[in-house]
Amino acid sequence: MPGLHPGMHSGWEAETMREMGEAAASWLVGRLGEMEEALAALVEVNSWTNNVEGGRKVGALLREQLALPGLGAEVVPSTRFADHLVFRSKGKAGLKPVALVGHLDTVFPPGKFEGYRQDGALRRGPGVLDMKGGLVVITWALKALAASGGLESLPPLRLVVVSDEEVGSPEGADVIRKAIEGADACLVFESGRAGDAIITRRKGTGMATAVAHGKAAHAGNNHQDGANALWALARFVDRVQQLTDYPRGITINVGKVTGGQGKNTVPDHAVAEVDLRFCTRADGEELVRRFRQAAEEAASGVPGTRIEVEGGVAREPLERTEASAALMAAYGSCAHVSGLGHGEAALVGGGSDASTSSAMGIPSIDGLGPRGKGFHTVDEFIEVDTLIPKAQALARYLASRAG
């Protein structure tokens, strides 16, 4: 139904939800300029996770862009980061909510990578892919649906935008859990992959700090009186590195070790910082157990030392289930009609907020933002022509849920 405009839906009722989805897809045609203008406004504001003022400015822009009939906005205050945002619609009675999840923070501190730039068919800038582009996709899909039958015709929507995803969502995870409880599906609009592949699996992530304690002594006069914390920690590092199991998708990386004060002093203190990745919740729990066991064994081999292990699982994995595979197929059919790819992505090593929804038992898929490359680098870009079809795919999917 070409030619629809935001003010033309008054009194108009779509005969079927499929027609509503097609009307929304038609409404989006020719609106790339609007979408790009909104994206540029978001990208031009630095919203590094620790830039609270910048994050709040981006949040204010999002609230303006999402000021739609039937969509309420809630600001969830933060004491550490920019405020988190939760948008809700009442939706059609009898239908379970659908959750849409994103984040407004980026990884670039002020001065590192700034501004929005056009480069032929590409658009470059901090967060253009990860993931302000995804937020624009969500926003314009909802605008199209509001203009083509109204959000009240859809399932209840729960849109959550957190401000701390890039540091593991220490606050945002709880905001998400509270907002989307009872949802029947969760779609996450992180960076779109090559071929528009849909993410159904992400590794879980963890972090651990091992602190070795020993006894200082002069290395020449009283070596025998010391207890070498670095030696105990070295034994620990060797043990935990051997827990890596590539066929099972388990990796351990001891990325930083510090300790000691000089070559002529037996060190009484040493610290190792460790990254953990795993594919199943059971593997994550087992890794934490084996870490603590390795610490005990390593210290027992160096009399007078002990090793304390802090940390553990930070994000549960996004695990593929029959329900998430069905969700991928349903969304994928809408993506295909919209001219996009709809295959399944390979296992992804990094975590996202899809892991939070998945751990709640909610079928979840990810990577639905605009197609691009280079997230977390100064080469970050999107293919601008994917903005409209990505929004069309979401609009068609949400309409299909109400049919």
Feature map (PLM): residue ranges:
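Metal-dependent amide/peptide-bond hydrolase catalytic core
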Residues: 18-23, 30, 47, 70, ...
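Acidic/His- and Gly-rich active-site-bordering loop/insert found
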Residues: 18-126, 147-153, 354
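Acidic/histidine-rich catalytic neighborhood of metal-dependent amide-processing enzymes
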Residues: 131-203, 245, 402-403
